[in-house]
Curated annotation (Swiss-Prot):
Compartment(s): Secreted
Keyword Disulfide bond (UniProt): yes
Signal peptide: 1-21
Tissue and organ distribution: Expressed by the venom gland.
Keyword Endoplasmic reticulum: no
Protein name, UniProt field: U5-theraphotoxin-Hs1a 4
Propeptide residue intervals: 22-49
Disulfide bonding pattern of the chain: C51-C63, C56-C68, C62-C75
Length: 83
């Protein structure tokens, strides 16, 4: 029930945006609006997320909390199960 209401409301909002853009003189308005709505904010990015899966060797260390995998040669999470 909640999902169907959310999808219906989302559909109505998108229909409104589409109708407004078709009446608008600017043809790029929907793209600008949607890109501003879904733009990723750099403040929410965590530095350590970028380290997971990065290529490494023992000379080039990983971020804190990650270690260089001996087998795969990329940064993995450090934990008690790791050697």
């Amino acid at each position: 029930m909640k999902t169907s209401m959310f999808l219906t409301l989302t559909g109505l909002v998108l229909l409104f945006v589409d109708c407004y853009a078709s009446e608008s003189e600017e043809k790029e308005f929907p793209k600008e609006l949607l890109s501003s709505i879904f733009a990723a904010d750099s403040d929410f990015k965590v530095e350590e997320r970028g380290c997971l899966g990065d290529k490494c060797d023992y000379n080039n260390g990983c971020c804190s909390g990650y270690v260089c995998s001996r087998t795969w040669k990329w940064c993995v999470l450090a934990g008690p199960w790791r050697r």
